[in-house]
């Protein structure tokens, strides 16, 4: 019996049924029609100059890459409300969370999300043990 070796097939990324290569070629109006309602509304309204300049910096950093496989230079921003579009895929962005710039590499799955979603501005709470006076029964707990 000869065993046939099965090749692994990987699922190609699609956004709303459109392949990634096609997404990069779409015009702005066609892209807007694919996005969810909140993202459509944001892109239909006037885009702030700050966001346009950020996209220009992303384009420039991707164009400056000389070797294949090399990551583009970090592009920092304080704007947490920039919508991620297909043009930004592959860029490395630094999103300010109020303390530091968190480095994020933009992946296709991030399309339609805001930059702030990938840089949390708070630290999750790890509750310690309750102290004296936390509850009525804690009066009877010895101090140590």
From Swiss-Prot:
Short name of any one Pfam family annotated for the protein: Ribosomal_S19
Give me the Gene Ontology terms describing cellular component: cytosolic small ribosomal subunit
One GO-annotated biological process of the protein: translation
Q: Which UniProt keywords apply?
A: Ribonucleoprotein, Ribosomal protein
Q: InterPro entries, per this entry?
A: Ribosomal_uS19, Ribosomal_uS19_euk/arc, Ribosomal_uS19_SF
Extract the SUPFAM superfamilies matched here. Ribosomal protein S19
GO MF term list: structural constituent of ribosome
Q: Which family does it belong to?
A: Belongs to the universal ribosomal protein uS19 family.
Q: What is this protein called?
A: Small ribosomal subunit protein uS19
Which gene underlies this protein? rps15
